[in-house]
A protein has these predicted regions:
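Sec-dependent N-terminal signal peptides
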Residues: 4-14
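Formylglycine-dependent sulfatase
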Residues: 2, 16-455, 459-461, 470-491, ...
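Residues forming the ATP-binding cleft of Hanks-type serine/threonine protein kinase domains
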Residues: 467
C-alpha cells in the first residue's frame, strides 16, 4: 500500500529471504499487440516462448495503456503517472524531464541495481540507472548504433533483437553485483515499423495467407475522427518503406528512409536481402495490382514481415528465460513481458496505434511469478501501465509515493481479488497535428462501455457498447435510449479527470 513498506521477507522461501528481495526483469517491446501473441490469440502466429511466461504465471486480459504512443507510454511506465503529470505527452515535441521522481530512482534508493538496455526513446539522457546502453531514437534493425554511458556511440554488428538480448544477458552475468537485487529493463526495438526481418527468417511465412480482419473495409460511418486518420494500409502504407517494393524508378515519400536503413547491411547480408526482396518486387510488378487487390497485397506483405520480426523476438525472449533458469534466478525473479502499446493488424483497415479503440488501447501483459506469489492463469481486473511503477516498488518493499497515480498489482499477483479494485480506465492521447493525423482525444472505459471525446480542431463524442459491438463500429452517442448511460459515464469521466488532475477539464468542462 502507498506510504507503507511491504513486509515481504517473512513470507519468502528461505533462499529468497537470505538473498533479500525479488529481482525484476522487465521485457518491453515496441508495437507488439495481443492479436500477435498466441496465448491471447492463436489465429496468426505461434509465440511459444512468450507463452512460457504466461504458462508459469499470469496473463492479464484487461491490460491497457494511458497514452498509446511509444515515448509517452514509456514515461507513464517509469513514473507511474499519466502523461499530463509526467510532462511527456507526445513524440513530436516531447522531452522527458529526467530530474523528476521515477521508479528506477526509487528502487535504486531502496538498494536495487538498475539497468536499461535497448530502446529509450525519451530524448534526454537516462537517469536513475546504474547502467545503461541504449539505441538512439528508434534505433535500427541492422548493425545498430548504441550509446554508452560515456556518451560515445558504437556501431554493433548483427540484428538488433539478438544484440539487445546479448547485452542483457552479459549484464546479468558479468556486470552486476550479484549480492544485490536488481531490476533490468530489456527494451526491444521490435516490432516497430518498418519490420525488417532477421536474415535467417527472410523466407518464413511466405507460404501463409493471413485472414483479413472483418473490419478491414470499415467505412468509418458516424466516426469522423476515425475517417480523418492517415494510417490506412491501402492509402498510407508506404510501398517501399513498409512493404519493401522498390526499384530505381519508384520514388515514394519514405523511400530514402528505407534505403538508409538497408544501407547499414554488410555486403553479404545485403546480397541475400536484395535477392529475396528483388524477387518479391518483380512478382509485384508483374501482377499490376489496383484497388482492393493492391490493398490486400500490402496487408499480406505487412503481416508476413511483422511475423518474421516477431519470430526473432520470441526466440530471444526464450534465450532470456533460459539464461535465468540456468543461472538459478527464475525462482527469485519476477519476469514481466509487455509492449508499449497495442497495434492495428489490419483492423479498421489500419496499421499503427494512437486511438483509444481496443486494438491499440489494450496491450499484452504476462508475468512469470517467482516463489511466494501464487496467482496463476488469467487475471481479469483492469490494469494500466501506470500500475507498473507502484507494483515494482511494492514488490521491493519500497515506499510508494502518494503522488504516483497507478496502483500496485501485488495483491493480484498473490491471488487476491480486492473488492475495491478500479472499475474503469482513463485515457488521453495528445499528439496532433502529427504523423497519421489522429485527433487528440480522452475517454473512459468500463467493463461494458467506452466514451471518448475527440477535441482540438474537432468536437466529437463517441460511445460504444463493447458487449454488443466489440469492434466499435456503431457510435451510440446521442442515440435514443442511451441518455442514462451517457450521463453516468460523463459523471465518472469528470471524476477521473479531477482525480488524475488533468487540466483538460478546464478547457472542456463536463457539466
Amino acid at each position: 500500500m502507498k506510504n507503507n513498506l511491504l513486509l515481504l521477507l517473512p513470507v519468502l522461501p528461505a533462499t529468497l529471504a537470505a538473498q533479500g528481495r525479488y529481482n525484476i526483469v522487465y521485457i518491453m517491446t515496441d508495437d507488439h499487440t495481443a492479436q500477435m501473441m498466441s496465448c491471447y490469440d492463436n489465429r496468426y502466429v505461434q509465440t511459444p516462448n512468450l507463452d512460457r511466461i504466461a504458462a508459469d504465471g499470469v496473463k492479464f486480459v484487461n491490460s491497457f495503456v494511458a497514452n498509446s504512443l511509444s515515448g509517452p507510454s514509456r514515461a507513464c511506465m517509469l513514473t507511474g503517472k499519466h502523461s499530463h503529470k509526467n510532462g511527456f505527452t507526445n513524440n513530436e515535441h516531447g522531452v522527458f524531464d529526467g530530474t523528476q521522481q521515477t521508479m528506477p530512482k526509487l528502487l535504486r534508493a531502496a538498494g536495487y541495481q538498475t539497468a536499461i538496455i535497448g530502446k529509450w526513446h525519451l530524448v534526454t539522457t537516462p537517469t536513475g540507472f546504474d547502467y545503461w546502453n541504449i539505441v538512439p531514437g528508434q534505433g535500427d534493425y541492422y548493425n545498430p548504433d548504441f550509446i554508452k554511458m560515456d556518451q560515445s556511440t558504437v556501431r554493433e554488428h548483427g540484428y538488433v533483437t539478438d544484440i539487445i538480448t546479448d547485452k542483457s544477458i552479459d549484464w546479468m552475468e558479468n556486470k552486476r553485483d550479484k549480492s544485490r537485487p536488481f531490476i533490468l529493463f530489456i527494451h526491444h526495438k521490435a516490432c516497430h515499423r518498418n519490420w525488417l526481418p532477421e536474415m535467417k527468417y527472410l523466407h518464413e511465412y511466405e507460404d501463409v495467407t493471413f485472414p483479413i480482419p472483418e473490419t478491414f473495409y470499415d467505412n468509418y460511418a458516424g466516426r469522423p475522427a476515425a475517417k480523418a486518420q492517415e494510417m490506412e494500409i491501402g492509402k498510407d502504407m508506404d510501398l517501399t518503406y513498409d512493404t519493401k517494393i522498390y526499384s530505381p524508378d519508384l520514388k515514394t515519400r519514405l523511400s530514402q528512409n528505407y534505403f538508409n536503413m538497408i544501407g547499414r547491411l554488410d555486403s553479404e547480408d545485403r546480397s541475400r536481402y536484395d535477392h529475396f526482396y528483388d524477387s518479391i518486387a518483380a512478382d509485384f510488378r508483374a501482377r499490376k495490382l489496383e484497388g482492393r487487390a493492391l490493398t490486400e497485397y500490402k496487408y499480406q506483405r505487412y503481416m508476413r514481415d511483422y511475423a518474421k520480426v516477431l519470430k526473432s523476438l520470441d526466440d530471444n525472449v526464450g534465450r532470456t528465460l533460459d539464461y535465468l533458469r540456468d543461472a538459478g534466478l527464475l525462482d527469485s525473479t519476477l519476469v514481466v513481458y509487455t509492449s508499449d502499446q497495442g497495434f492495428y493488424m489490419g483492423e479498421h483497415g489500419w496499421f499503427d496505434k494512437r486511438f483509444m479503440y481496443e486494438e491499440s488501447f489494450s496491450t499484452p501483459l504476462v508475468m512469470r511469478l517467482p516463489e511466494g506469489l501464487k496467482a496463476r492463469g488469467e487475471i481479469r481486473e483492469a490494469v494500466q501501465n501506470i500500475d507498473y511503477a507502484p507494483t515494482f516498488l511494492d514488490l521491493a518493499g519500497a515506499p510508494i509515493p502518494a503522488d504516483i497515480q497507478g496502483v500496485s498489482l501485488l495483491p493480484l499477483l498473490r491471488g487476491e481479488h480486492p473488492k475495491k479494485w478500479r472499475n474503469d480506465i482513463y485515457y488521453h492521447y495528445h499528439e496532433y497535428p502529427a504523423e497519421h493525423a489522429v485527433k487528440r482525444h480522452y475517454g473512459i472505459r468500463t467493463e461494458r462501455y467506452k466514451l471518448m471525446h475527440f477535441y482540438n480542431d474537432i468536437d466529437v463524442w463517441e460511445l460504444y457498447d463493447l458487449q454488443t459491438d466489440p469492434n466499435e463500429l456503431h457510435n451510440l452517442y446521442g442515440q435514443p435510449g442511451m441518455e442514462k448511460v451517457t450521463k453516468q459515464l460523463m459523471k465518472r469521466l469528470k471524476q477521473l479527470q479531477i482525480q488524475y488532475e488533468d487540466p483538460i477539464l478546464e478547457k472542456y468542462p463536463i457539466k
